[in-house]
Curated annotation (Swiss-Prot):
InterPro entries noted in UniProt: Aldolase_TIM (IPR013785), GH59_C (IPR049162), GH59_cat (IPR049161), Glyco_hydro_59 (IPR001286), Glyco_hydro_59_dom (IPR035394), Glycoside_hydrolase_SF (IPR017853)
Organism: Macaca mulatta
Coiled-coil regions, chain positions: none
Catalytic activity, reaction form: a beta-D-galactosyl-(1<->1')-N-acylsphing-4-enine + H2O = an N-acylsphing-4-enine + D-galactose; beta-D-galactosyl-(1<->1)-sphing-4-enine + H2O = sphing-4-enine + D-galactose; a D-galactosylceramide + H2O = an N-acyl-sphingoid base + D-galactose
EC numbers, comma separated: 3.2.1.46
Family of this protein: Belongs to the glycosyl hydrolase 59 family.
Keyword check for GTP-binding: no
This protein's UniProt keywords: Disulfide bond, Glycoprotein, Glycosidase, Hydrolase, Lipid degradation, Lipid metabolism, Lysosome, Signal, Sphingolipid metabolism
Active-site residue numbers: 198 (proton donor/acceptor), 274 (nucleophile)
Highest taxon above the source species: Eukaryota
One annotated GO biological process: myelination
Name of the protein described by the UniProt record: Galactocerebrosidase
Family annotation (Pfam families): Glyco_hydro_59, Glyco_hydro_59_C, Glyco_hydro_59M
Organism classification: Eukaryota, Metazoa, Chordata, Craniata, Vertebrata
Molecular function terms, GO-annotated: galactosylceramidase activity
Length: 685
């Protein structure tokens, strides 16, 4: 447990000793005279010379892409519990900001998110799950800041080009409709809007976007640019007065706690508008704790936003478990409140947007950092971190070596804080299980002597919050159900008359968009189906495949039988597939291997070892046309695979040596309309 040492009056020492007997299970806190303390650094916290920059909050990203995909399928009460740990004030991560992807139909890291406008004359503000997530966040914290940012765009905006700036007015219109729709259909006020995630910005587009926002009465919506690097946008703003005027926040990604001179010269708010992206182990928590402090200490960034909010996607997709917490098993209800949640709480539960950093923040003498914030009404929060190099490496950028060692740190409260009588203390220690504590409340610290100082003994990988606020809480629920594998028998007939979400449970679209569909041409068995709805390639953010594909199941499945009814809508050139042992997804989807069983409207079939269709195991002619339902069956057992069409054998015992395991999948030959029904898988590992 932490040893933190206080220079205090005799009255406080007596109080501490008498209280110790009744404090079983709480922190052991020895209090010593100043004269007995080991030498160490002294740090003054003072507002006499004014305050630093305004604090804008700590948040996280849902999307970029499909990172919350499995969350929506969780049964209650577990889904609500997960949301409470993320958003409920004074309970868990208690986030101030939620940033969501404006779905654009393209692959954006771990899947695709649907656009509200698949086609030029199409508008639907109930697709996907980001609307729902924003409402759930607002339900828990009405003051939460909402941000929207596009990663990809629907293809029609590009007019044949893979570029969103072909028609600046049209792209601005598309983005503004999303903001207007959020308010009209969901009563959500979007606070900030971004440009194009980690891709090129267009200065004229930003200016047009501002004008169009104003024309719709959306003057309150502020613009963040450019969600990439500091350099280009900052330099451009210094040279372009109109651009300078319309950009409210300069947002950089993975800045390594540093900003650049041009960004600071603008005087604009500086944000780390995407950061973290690290496995949510204790090392990830150390990364998060270090950058939450040092983004301001080193770079004057007043907001830090984590990618991603919750690791709610299949773990074997890229960046598995790189969320603040993990919720990737809706079939079992199991979830894990990971240590980054409690590291977040050290800042989020004891500050609010609109507070101000003190000017007196900085680095500790023997490693680590400290920040202090105030609401200007007498409240003070101090956050101290001593994260070691070994246990605080983020996924990027490269972290130069630094050393952290045991030290004594004396903090002196001056200015309006000199008369503060008491500070609440919250503590985290990362590392060995026997020494590990997460967001533990310690005995409060009384400051009864006249100089308002206290001394802490700090060791590596620790996090302290000392605050005048008494509202902190480590929320908890009964443990969720135990972890379970994806069911080895899984069926979905897609018979949902009024679906709450547009996507079927557990299917994770990797290229294309698969939605519940009411087939008015078939009032019978196939009245309700799952349909691939994109008819052109989106303006991509990643390397989307040339085929559409949605994965499902357990990545460790080896032997399985997949059966599905399929319906090709495109004559002559159309085609569909079912697949097993699919070994890649996300931004790697183009190179996915597996066993793919295709049929085509031109009367042919094919069996391939990859999604791209380069590895051909078998091919031939078959009686297949468009606009007819067929049943495909794919059986994979050991080193061999077989396929059936309408329950009749079409090909048998084809050798398949690689891959050994992977997901099940459905998809289409190109960006084309097609339907799927009565999906059924039987699997063994």
């Amino acid at each position: 447990m932490a040893e933190w040492l206080l220079s205090a009056s005799r009255q406080r020492r007596v109080k501490a000793m008498t209280a110790a007997a009744g404090s079983a299970g709480r922190a052991a806190v020895p209090f010593l005279l100043c004269a007995l303390l080991a030498p160490g650094g002294a740090y003054v916290l003072d507002d006499s010379d004014g305050l630093g920059r305004e604090f804008d909050g700590i948040g996280a990203v849902s999307g970029g892409g499909a990172t919350s995909r499995l969350l929506v399928n969780y049964p209650e009460p577990y889904r609500s519990q997960i949301l409470d740990y993320l958003f409920k004030p004074n309970f868990g991560a208690s986030l101030h900001i939620l940033k969501v992807e404006i779905g654009g139909d393209g692959q954006t890291t771990d899947g695709t998110e649907p656009s509200h406008m698949h086609y030029a004359l199409d508008e639907n503000y109930f697709r996907g799950y980001e609307w729902w997530l924003m409402k759930e966040a607002k339900k828990r914290n009405p003051n939460i800041t909402l941000i929207g940012l596009p990663w990809s765009f629907p293809g029609w905006l590009g007019k044949g080009f893979d570029w969103p700036y072909v028609n600046l007015q049209l792209t601005a219109y598309y983005v503004v409709t999303w903001i207007v729709g959020a308010k009209r259909y969901h009563d959500l006020d979007i606070d900030y809007i971004g440009i194009w995630n980690e891709r090129s910005y267009n200065a004229n587009y930003i200016k047009i976007l501002r004008k169009m926002l104003n024309s719709q009465g959306l003057q309150r919506v502020k613009i963040i640019a450019s969600d990439n690097l500091w350099e280009s946008i900052s330099a451009a703003m210094l040279l372009d007065a109109e651009l300078f005027k319309v950009v409210d926040v300069i947002g950089a990604h993975y800045p390594g706690t540093h900003s650049v001179k041009d960004a600071r010269l603008t005087g604009k708010k500086l944000w780390s508008s995407e950061d973290f992206s690290t496995l949510n182990s204790d090392t990830g928590a150390g990364c998060w704790g270090r950058i939450l402090n040092q983004n301001y200490v080193n770079g004057y960034m007043t907001s830090t936003i984590a990618w991603n909010l919750v690791a709610s996607y299949y773990e074997q997709l890229p960046y598995g478990r790189c969320g603040l917490m993990t919720a990737q098993e809706p079939w079992s209800g199991h979830y894990v409140v990971e240590s980054p949640v409690w590291v977040s709480a050290h800042t989020t539960q004891f500050t609010q947007p609109g507070w101000y950093y003190l000017k007196t923040v900085g680095h500790l003498e023997k490693g680590g950092s400290y920040v202090a914030l105030t609401d200007g009404l007498g409240n003070l929060t101090i956050i101290i971190e001593t994260m070691s190099h070994k246990h605080s490496k983020c996924i990027r950028p490269f972290l130069p070596y630094f050393n952290v060692s045991q030290q004594f740190a004396t903090f002196v409260l001056k200015g309006s804080f000199s008369e503060i009588p008491e500070l609440q203390v919250w503590y985290t220690k990362l590392g060995k299980t026997s020494e590990r504590f997460l967001f533990k409340q310690l005995d409060s610290l009384w400051l009864l002597d006249s100089n308002g100082s206290f001394t802490l003994k700090l060791q590596e990988d620790e996090l302290f919050t000392l605050t005048t606020l008494t509202t902190g809480r480590k929320g908890s629920y009964l443990p969720p159900p135990k972890s379970q594998r994806f069911p080895s028998t899984y069926k979905d007939d897609f018979n949902v008359d009024y679906p709450f979400f547009s996507e079927a449970p557990n299917f994770a679209d990797q290229t294309g968009v698969f939605e519940y569909f009411t087939n008015m041409e078939d009032p019978g068995e196939h009245h309700f189906t799952l349909r691939q709805v994109l008819n052109q390639r989106p303006i991509t953010w990643a390397a989307d495949a040339s085929n559409t594909i949605s994965i499902i199941g357990d990545y460790n499945w080896t032997n399985l039988t997949i059966k599905c009814d399929v319906y090709i809508e495109t004559p002559d050139t159309g085609g569909v597939f079912i697949a097993g042992r699919v070994n890649k997804g996300g931004i790697l989807i183009r190179s996915a291997r597996g066993i793919f069983f295709w049929i085509f409207a031109n009367g042919s079939y094919r069996v391939t070892g990859d999604l791209a269709g380069w590895i051909i195991y078998a091919l031939g002619h078959v009686e297949v046309t468009a606009k007819t339902w067929y049943t495909l069956t794919l059986t994979i057992k050991g080193r061999f695979a077989s396929g059936m069409l309408n329950d009749k054998s079409l090909w048998t015992d084809i050798p398949v040596n690689f891959p050994k395991n992977g997901w099940a999948a459905i998809g289409t030959h190109s960006f084309e309309f097609a339907q799927f029904d009565n999906f059924h898988v039987e699997a063994t590992r």
